[in-house]
């Protein structure tokens, strides 16, 4: 791996307890989520985020980096703010822990913010996004060549979402989240999103669809504000939502109309992609009655994938074996620091294992070059 610097396309911060109270507009301050300390029935203390009296996530659910290598049985998603690694909220400490992992730079995404997409109050969700976007922009200013922030958009109101997207670009953010699945009555095939697609294309801002960011109220979706509703089946099949949304965009002709738009899957891993591409191409060719769109350029759905989409993953060795079908240029690796699934601090070992026998050029693209180009890291990262 000599000769280039590894970049994590998917790392996270952990939002400080006072982020929203300090950053949100005054009219929303009384309703801002807060961290409260409670005890379990056995007397163990833990911190959790609360919104209007309802628990909407524990601090411990996003701070378990490294435990899988020490004692995976101890991962119970309980914890105190004092347990959070300083690197998760302080940029210089972040750089130190990335270096410990053999990583030079990182694209930083929210942690608790993933849960906010499930809020029913759209106006408040937008305010939380604005508060976070300002904070993460300031965080990355400590090392703008090595830390790239990803903002959050609420796209319930497309015009409002486009305004915030423009602000994110002005703040220097490298991309933005949109819900992996929007409100149930307005999937991404709707023309109402065309201004969003145009704005993202015009600003060269990638749109990222992260696991567990479905909007609230979607029938059959177990990612709700009540974490107890999530079952093993719901988690293991979470890639359904990303497949549906990306397929809806392709078959609505979004990438015909916006050929430079870039949209990506985050943390759904990647081995599902080949079968999905095959199914889309089959449907396009063999089931024309199920589609109302015909490619302007005679392209198959799989060809739009290769031109307009990307996938971020952590340790999908099956995906590496299938890289020629998925597309080496479409794959980006991330260490998911500081979450329980993170490969930190053993990312180098994981990369050596999953890339065993893989050409060095492919490994470099997936672990460095693709992220550098997509998120505009400095030439120093080459």
PLM feature segments, named:
Residues 2-5, 16-85, 89-105, 134-142, ...:
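Mid-to-C-terminal alpha-helical segments outside catalytic/metal-binding sites
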Residues 11-12, 336-337:
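Active-site metal-binding loops of divalent metal-dependent hydrolases
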Residues 15, 109, 179:
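Conserved residues at the C-terminal ends of beta-strands
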Residues 69-85, 114-119, 228-235:
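Short glycine/proline-rich turn/loop motifs
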Residues 79-86, 103-120, 124, 144-152:
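Short, well-structured secondary-structure segments
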Residues 83-87, 125-126, 236-244:
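Short acidic-aromatic active-site loops that bind/stabilize oxyanions
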Residues 125, 129-132, 189-195:
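Charged helix-capping and loop-helix junction motifs
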Residues 140-148, 153, 157-159, 163-332:
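Catalytic pocket-lining loop regions of alpha/beta-barrel enzymes
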